[in-house]
A protein has these predicted regions:
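Acidic/histidine-rich catalytic neighborhood of metal-dependent amide-processing enzymes
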Residues: 134-227, 231, 252
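Signal peptide processing junction and immediate N-terminal pro/mature segment
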Residues: 9-26
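Second-shell loop/turn segments in exported
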Residues: 28-34, 48-59, 86-90, 132-143, ...
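Stable alpha-helical elements in mature extracytoplasmic
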Residues: 36-46, 50, 59, 63, ...
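Active-site-adjacent substrate-binding region
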Residues: 86, 201, 210-316
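Solvent-exposed loop/turn segments at secondary-structure junctions
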Residues: 53-55, 84-86, 105-108, 118-122, ...
């Protein structure tokens, strides 16, 4: 789950500009675009077919194993990062796992962490009926979508030049709740237990699967990772994705990216929060689309192929 900060007038959209042009601009139109939106969609539905992936359930364990198996296939190495939490709702310890996969990591010149949460919300807080609020959500968009993009993307980034190292990070416990103090748990754990070498920057995917996807600039990302955010959204324009990734601000979001920014990893949050099915029982594949997954995957695939030595300190 993510949260809007209404007190910061987050819903006042306005254009974002930086007054500079890229010194590293290439002919992005010629970059290979191999991301398969149909295969990404299959990953979304496979997760949903397992049921609600709430920590402590069989569906959660099956999803962990599904992601880990595919990560092992496509990465040089993969590992589980276990952690636990004494959950206020049950007063019992809940076991959770981050899942990490590395490509070209040790000897790379630039390292990026790509992350998404794989758990789903235990309670449909936004439902109107009190009885429905106690039920878990399926999380087709809020959970499965970001994971689906990354699982398909990692097939293609194996061929990225060795100068770029990639960590695929699937975080758990993002949406446990019900309060903020019991959310974003996997990202917090990862950030507190960083191993060397440290990522140079990060890109978070959250709620990127809805139909007619529009991902604006997230204000916390702009403040904390300005160079990365502007460079990525300029790249979206270069690859004809400006309608999906417009250079204008959206709502301010509390999300996993804040924990990474807190430990010095500039990280951008790619999220479309205008989703009426958020934290309801209607967060199902019916309201998502393969096309949206394809646009996000294409953005990242072309960015990674183009920007193999890019760092947040570079002028871009």
């Amino acid at each position: 789950m993510v949260l809007q900060l209404f007190a910061l007038a987050a819903l006042l959209f306005h254009p974002v500009t930086d007054g500079s042009e890229s010194n590293l601009r290439q002919d992005s139109a010629k970059l290979e675009k191999n991301f398969d939106q149909k295969l990404a969609w299959n990953w979304l539905t496979k997760q949903c077919d397992l049921g609600c992936r709430v920590p402590g359930t069989d569906a959660h364990l099956k999803c962990r194993d599904l992601i880990l198996e595919e990560t092992k296939k496509n990465c040089d190495s993969a590992e589980l990062q276990p952690f636990g939490w004494l959950w206020s709702k049950t007063n019992k310890r809940v076991s959770m796992w981050n899942i990490l996969g590395y490509q070209n990591w040790e000897n790379a010149k630039t390292r990026v962490v790509l992350l998404a949460h794989w758990d789903t919300r235990p309670s449909a807080d936004e439902e109107l009926k009190p009885a429905d609020r106690k039920k878990p959500i399926l999380g087709a968009n809020d959970g499965a979508s970001g994971v689906a993009v990354l699982l398909e993307l990692m097939r293609h980034t194996k061929s990225v030049p060795k100068d770029l190292g990639i960590c695929y990070l699937f975080v758990d416990g993002e949406d446990l709740g019900p309060g903020l103090e019991e959310m974003f748990l996997g990202a917090v754990h990862y950030s507190k237990h960083l191993k060397s070498p440290k990522p140079d920057y990060g890109i978070l995917l959250d709620m990127v699967g809805k139909k007619d996807l529009v991902v604006p600039v997230e204000p916390n990302s702009l403040e904390l990772a300005r160079g990365l955010t502007l460079a990525l959204f300029r790249h979206a324009k270069e690859v004809d994705l400006a309608k999906t990734f417009p250079m204008e601000q959206g709502p301010t979001i509390l999300d996993d990216h804040l924990s990474l920014n807190d430990v010095g990893i500039p990280t951008v949050d790619l999220i479309d929060f205008e989703y009426p099915q958020w934290h309801t029982l209607k967060d199902t594949p019916e309201y998502c689309s393969a096309e949206s997954l394809g646009k996000v995957g294409t953005l990242l695939e072309t960015w990674l192929k183009k920007s193999t030595v890019w760092k947040p300190t570079a002028k871009f």
